UniProtKB/Swiss-Prot annotation:
Domain 4Fe-4S ferredoxin-type residues, every copy: 35-65, 74-103
Highest taxon, organism lineage: Archaea
Cofactor(s) the record lists: [3Fe-4S] cluster; [4Fe-4S] cluster; Zn(2+)
Cofactor binding notes: Binds 1 [3Fe-4S] cluster.
Keyword Cytoplasm in record: no
Residues reported to bind Zn(2+): 19, 34, 76
PTM-bearing positions, type N6-methyllysine: 29
Location of the region described as N-terminal extension in the Swiss-Prot/TrEMBL record: 1-36
Biological classification of the source: Archaea, Thermoproteota, Thermoprotei, Sulfolobales, Sulfolobaceae
Protein name, per record: Zinc-containing ferredoxin
Function description: Ferredoxins are iron-sulfur proteins that transfer electrons in a wide variety of metabolic reactions.
Organism of origin: Sulfolobus acidocaldarius (strain ATCC 33909 / DSM 639 / JCM 8929 / NBRC 15157 / NCIMB 11770)
Entry binding sites for [4Fe-4S] cluster: 55, 83, 86, 89
Signal peptide stretch: none
Length: 103
């Protein structure tokens, strides 16, 4: 699953749709973790969509990631500021790719 310490153990290597990207990133095979409040490990995400369905405040949007070995799209936490910390996404993710931490 996602490393719950990624916010301090991984360097910030970029910014995407208003949230940080934690590296390393070597596109298209290694995409890192997207988000700080709601972190999605893009290298674990298999795009089954359960988090998108479960989230009551629409934190996630699909993001195309052609060429990634796990899946060709990811659940991107573009609206992480809207998170109400219900943990529905964490609880339904089949590969434990999501970590939520209030700011």
């Amino acid at each position: 699953g996602i490393d719950p310490n990624y916010r301090t153990s991984k360097p910030v290597v970029g910014d995407h749709s208003g949230h940080k990207i934690y590296g390393p990133v070597e596109s298209p095979k290694v995409l890192g973790v997207h988000g700080t409040i709601v972190g999605v490990d893009f290298d674990l995400c298999i795009a089954d969509g359960s988090c998108i369905t479960a989230c009551p405040v629409n934190v996630f949007q699909w993001y195309e990631t052609p060429g990634h070995p796990a899946s060709e799209k990811k659940a991107d936490p573009v609206n992480e500021q809207a998170c109400i910390f219900c943990m529905a996404c964490v609880n339904v993710c089949p590969v434990a790719a999501i970590d939520v931490k209030p700011p």
